[in-house]
Amino acid sequence: MELIRTEIPYCEPSHEALSSFSESTDAIVPDAFPDMGRIICAAGAATVKDELPQTDRILVSGMVNAVVLYQPEGESGVRKLSVPLSFAHIEEARGVTAESVCFVRCRVGGVTAKAVNSRKVSVTAQLCVETDVYERRTVELTEQIDPQADALEILSGQETIPLLEDAAVREFTLLDDLEIPGGERLEIVTASCELGLAGCQAMNGRAALKGDARLTLLALDDTGAFQVLHQTIPYTQIVECEDVQEGRTLAARLAVRHLDCMFAEGGVLSVGVGVGVLLLREGRHTLQTIRDLYHVHRTLELEERQLALRGCHLCGPFTGESTAVMPVSRPASEIISADAVCAGLQQSDDRTIRVSAQLSVLYRDADGVICSASRQLPVNVPIPASEASACVQDAALQVSATPGGEGNLNLRLTVSGQLTERPVLTLRDITALSVGAPRKPCGGVDTTLILRYIHAPEPLWEIAKQYASTVQAIRRANALAEHTESVSDAMLLIPVYNR
């Protein structure tokens, strides 16, 4: 008997993690700047330079462009101090090699600044890194057996699973100039960007991406007042995607790798967004499986294993809302800006995800003094029952804050992300097969036909296997329809062939 084995090439998600870490540095106030009096707030944006897969780990490195706003000693104005801060993070991931496909999303969860003295400041940036790793694999599976005789009975089946055919990382840059009324009077404090994807279409050897980049800028005008600006940049980009054919199912995930914003002459806002793209070529594979087998005359000696295939399917966008209360040291009278970053994500049950939200709020107190507050809060977000089997990736938070009572801020958070299903299909894989000793006679040495009453529903396959018969023989002997799979409350004639 010959095993007919089939090779199945596919791409498997092997590691996913959302982790947080911090990096610190000290900075000296430049000679041209006045002494620090009171630190108002600190913020920053991350630039990812490298995401290198190595043996059993991924090295993520880059730079945080941190900004410290302070009130000079003896003055009422606001000064901005830029502090570059490099970072390197090692994500442990067993099984990763240099050939692994890695996709990284890195965000600044928050920046804190503490004055060492009037000319020196210590800055700490909290970073949140989402890491996903995909491995290209090939497995062998016995889908058929050449019996080389009529005495081998095989019960075959089919299983369909969404397997990734390939994963690849690409990059592109969005460039645009935006007319901002009064922009010549503004100085950017910090900027952030959320990427939206409206469509991903497979072309021959390429992928067409369409969506928008949503910018949020915190700026100071020439009077020292804060302004929050929101701008949207639509985009259509073509990126290389080898071996993909037009019409195939293609999905994409996006990450901001760097963001550059500056006001040019005439108040024009020049924007450059570096975008990382994870392209996932999806496919639905139909596999023929061997559910059971037996030999009519002899026992079978076989070796088998349980083969687990992990699929991946991007189901679509997810949006959920929740509320929270954030305590602050000085009661707020006016909110200037509020920002939130996902620092952790856990599906607590079938209907709820638990989000660790890193919150930063800039506000004025009752005396008009500008204050800042940052805190990490757990937030429970409901999941619709229809989406309970999927996990949430690429989580982005939007937050609005209003002054509350008893020194609190009332927060409303919107969580958006990508729903992903990762089903695991376990298959029976026969790796070796041979015939053994003759089967024991059923009902006696000379028995060729057994009459049995079947009470409860019982599959014909199990009856045939037990009595060394075949399903087709039982159907013919009892004039059963070709599609009959089981019988109940019936007298059954069972031909016996094990002699």
Label the predicted regions.
Residues 1-444:
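Membrane-lipid interaction segments
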Residues 437-476, 481-499:
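Primarily a LysM-type cell-wall glycan-binding module
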